Amino acid sequence: MVRAAALAALSRGATLTAVSQETGISRAALRAWLIDPAPKRPALACPACADHAFPPRPSYVYLLGMYLGDGCVSRLRRTMSLRITCADSWPQIMDECERAIVAVTGRPVGRVPCEGCTDLVNYWQHWPCLFPQHGPGRKHERMIKLAGWQADLVRTDPRPLVRGLQPSDGCRITNTVHRPLPSGVRTYSYPRYLFTNHSADILRIYTDALDLLGISWRRNRWNSISVARRDAVAALDGFVGPKA
């Protein structure tokens, strides 16, 4: 790299004039490099507010699910922060979430340990652009609606959204039923997925994605969705599976 070669020459005692004549770099630029040797990272363009359409990115759709489930966007001095809380019991989910953040922004992710969990934190001024659902108060106390471009991405492939939502606010359990019969009590066990959220809007986003995938579901409580049919569970097992 020209920058590294120029700094190396200056460190060996070459004058600014000599290095400028050899490399074609101005003396002013060379002085600035001496003060701050590290190259400046170019500002990342925001894909949501750019002139071109947001490209289909499974990492973003997955991150959208994680944000709706366990994330928040907040202001920190002159920038914005995304914070997603992940349980320490499921390190693979934490690692996948971190990879998704890096894939979307190209920026490093900090890990802030808490009791029983870890907050993944990333600073970027454009987080409100990528998550227009951001707002004051808790999510279940305000309207949550996907923007048109977000809905288009989800329709392209709803699986990453479900994969992000399900681990954050859901689980895969084994349901056991005891049925009395003339011959005695018979026990049935079968797996099922549950998804719980106090926001009716987020529940609808989740079930709309299941509908797009042709996965049957039912509401077992006012704030909970159950997926229990054998074919539906098998479908979720194909791209979600148990937490790990």
Question: What does each model-found stretch correspond to?
Answer:
Residues 1-244:
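Internal intein/HINT superfamily modules and their associated LAGLIDADG
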